[in-house]
């Protein structure tokens, strides 16, 4: 008996996408229930309007959460419905009907590739915009608004360096502000101030209790001081918000521009932007890798059935997530560059996928 490859393709593809969407819907409902239960006290304490909770937070939280864990949802989906096919001896029937194991993989890979492309599009253009509203809501009604950025060092232009001991996001003020101008490896001028407050109307910094030292006259330096001075430099208040959360709000073009600017300034926060950039590329590919692993693990009929496959699959899926988070520590500790560290989980699990695929019954 032979089977039409096209019918098998449609059958597997529909099973894949259908199970994926149903699983996704159930997980979304569970996550919203648990998340709301965890945050309900803060919603009430901060008087968050119901309309904002639904439309500003959860409507934007859902695509963020779904996209972040879509490779794992794909993996669990493949484990569940492929185990059912194997338990019902459907895979044996397909293989004995003249369709090779490699040919049977095509609808799996097509479905995984479509999900990966959708995830990539969301990563680059949709999620950043929705993150703006989600993070704004969290800052307003969930998190502590009085936060500070400490020990900031920026190169704002060739030969110009800014040093700030701390920056308060509550009043947009930099404390212990210093601006140094360097020529031929020598400091030619230095501006120091107790604080520098951002004026959003004029786009200038208002220095308070400032000192200006000019070292261009040889051994003696000229000092000028005062209580207040407005100055415009190549630094804006947005530069102090470029951390691990704010890079999530930038589309791919803006993210690339931020990376170039931060590299010029010697900004240590560039690692957050680089991690975000490589995560946006690496995560969609993991859906394809985990699909291959899922099929290889669950296509054999086992005594334990779906339960054993699902338990092992979930354990492997969460080990992937943990390893993905652990690989970022290599970036934070300067052990590996982001371009290598972020891709390590995919490379390792691609090797595992190749081994399991080779061992799968054909």
PLM region spans:
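Transmembrane alpha-helices
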Residues: 1-158, 169, 186, 218, ...
């Amino acid at each position: 008996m032979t089977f039409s490859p096209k019918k098998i393709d449609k059958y597997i593809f529909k099973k894949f996408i259908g199970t994926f969407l149903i699983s996704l819907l159930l997980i979304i409902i569970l996550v919203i229930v648990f998340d709301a239960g965890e945050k309900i006290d803060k919603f009430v304490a901060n008087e968050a309007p119901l309309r904002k909770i639904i439309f500003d937070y959860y409507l934007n939280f859902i695509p963020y959460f779904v996209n972040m864990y879509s490779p794992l949802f794909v993996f669990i989906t493949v484990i569940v419905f492929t185990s059912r096919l194997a338990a019902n001896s459907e895979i044996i029937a397909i293989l004995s009907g003249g369709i090779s194991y490699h040919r049977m993989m095509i609808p799996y890979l097509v479905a995984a590739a479509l999900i990966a492309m959708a995830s990539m599009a969301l990563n680059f253009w949709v999620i950043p915009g929705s993150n703006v509203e989600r993070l704004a809501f969290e800052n307003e009604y969930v998190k502590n608004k009085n936060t500070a950025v400490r020990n900031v060092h920026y190169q704002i232009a060739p030969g110009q360096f800014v040093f700030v001991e701390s920056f308060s996001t509550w009043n947009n003020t930099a404390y212990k502000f210093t601006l140094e101008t360097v020529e031929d490896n020598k400091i030619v001028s230095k501006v120091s101030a107790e604080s520098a407050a951002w004026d959003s109307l004029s786009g200038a910094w208002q220095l308070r209790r400032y000192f200006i030292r000019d070292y261009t006259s040889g051994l003696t330096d000229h000092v000028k001081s005062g209580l207040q001075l407005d100055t415009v430099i190549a630094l804006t208040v947005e530069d102090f918000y470029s951390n691990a959360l704010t890079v999530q709000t930038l589309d791919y073009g803006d993210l690339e521009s931020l990376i170039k600017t931060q590299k010029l300034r010697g900004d240590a926060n560039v690692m957050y932007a680089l991690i975000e950039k490589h995560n946006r590329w690496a995560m969609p590919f993991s859906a394809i890798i985990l699909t291959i692993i899922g099929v290889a693990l669950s296509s054999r009929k086992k005594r334990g059935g779906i339960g054993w496959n699902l338990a092992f699959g979930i354990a492997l899926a969460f080990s992937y997530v943990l390893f993905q988070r652990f690989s970022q520590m290599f970036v934070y500790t300067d052990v590996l560059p982001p371009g290598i560290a972020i891709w390590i989980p995919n490379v390792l699990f691609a090797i595992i996928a190749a081994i399991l695929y080779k061992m799968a019954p054909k």
